[in-house]
Amino acid sequence: MKIKALSKLKPEEGIWLTEVEKPEMGHNDLLIRIKKTAICGTDVHIYNWDEWSQKTIPVPMVVGHEYVGEVVGIGQEVRGFEIGDRVSGEGHITCGHCRNCRGGRTHLCRNTTGVGVNRTGAFSEYLVIPAFNAFKIPAGISDDLASIFDPFGNAVHTALSFDLVGEDVLITGAGPIGIMAAAVAKHVGARHVVITDVNEYRLDLAKKMGVTRAVNVMNEKLEDVMSDLGMTEGFDVGLEMSGNPSAFNSMLTNMNHGGKISLLGIPPSDMTVDWNQVIFKGLVIKGIYGREMFETWYKMASLIQSGLDLTPIITHHYKIDDFQKGFDMMRSGMSGKVILDWE
């Protein structure tokens, strides 16, 4: 049976709507009928066919890894799921046999493969994943929100790596993940949450999500913002979401002694760092990759159930046949999360 899918068909700029064979599930898998998908920054990299994509993405391949759908098939060894369950899923497929997997630290699996990156993705009418990777969506959480659980998980993992209650938090990079991390920080009790970027559209979006200050670093100095807020010692926690070297070095400059930094943004490999700031301030830096399985997922659901409102981050919806408009919108930088509807 042929189904619709968005695929990387050629080693050049673009994504194409095509037909592929419906995937077949194994004994330990679920077959999921996709309802909605969201476009990730990674999908934009794949669309643009940048240096990372050229090294990483097999062609041809169905892409995409942010989704919500309904279980329509269950492998014979699978327990705990029923036909009709609403699910999203962890996009990192882990090996199960390395030391970290066996020690319960599956997000650190050295043999991880990615849905829509190294194996068939979710931009399709149907997806097969290991049942281990599926996460049931509680009633009361909308399909729209469920479809962005993957990037929301990046935000939650990054933000909740350190205690935020009563702390002053600096977030560099107001992409959708940075903005969601800011909303999480405010929701769990941070005092001042300051986010920086140069994109006014996204800074306005951050204001709608409740940040203390959204700072365009082209027009305003962080030192002046800290002074306005009555901060005399620097930020307690930093969340680096941009991969921008000057943003990271500005963060180091403005951290308090003993401050803690989560790094999610991917910088150039030759980024220059003022390590004296790290050493003499006694800073702690933690690299963040993906989501903790599945502690982050439970936290995500609980945060929404306890009143965290992420709806402003979803700014655009398109039918799957209009996927090109969705990618154009994401590439323009004038959007939050963009949802593609498969129904």
Curated annotation (Swiss-Prot):
Binding site for NAD(+): I177, D197, R202, L264, G265, I266, I288, Y289
Cofactor(s), by name: Zn(2+)
EC number(s) per entry: 1.1.1.103
Compartment(s): Cytoplasm
Keyword Cytoplasm belongs to the record: yes
Catalysed reactions listed for this entry: L-threonine + NAD(+) = (2S)-2-amino-3-oxobutanoate + NADH + H(+)
UniProt KW Disulfide bond keyword: no
Binding annotation for Zn(2+) 2: C95, C98, C101, C109
Cellular component GO terms, alphabetical: cytoplasm
Pathway stated in the Swiss-Prot or TrEMBL entry: Amino-acid degradation; L-threonine degradation via oxydo-reductase pathway; glycine from L-threonine: step 1/2
Family annotation (Pfam families): ADH_N, ADH_zinc_N
Gene Ontology biological process: L-threonine catabolic process to glycine
Predominant location category: cytoplasm
Residues annotated for Zn(2+) 1 binding in this entry: C40, H65, E66
Top EC class of this enzyme: oxidoreductase
Catalytic residues in the record: T42 (charge relay system), H45 (charge relay system)
Assembly mode: Homotetramer.
Family, similarity comment: Belongs to the zinc-containing alcohol dehydrogenase family.
HAMAP family xrefs: Thr_dehydrog (MF_00627)
PANTHER family associated with the record: L-THREONINE 3-DEHYDROGENASE (PTHR43401:SF2)
Function: Catalyzes the NAD(+)-dependent oxidation of L-threonine to 2-amino-3-ketobutyrate.
Protein name listed in UniProt: L-threonine 3-dehydrogenase
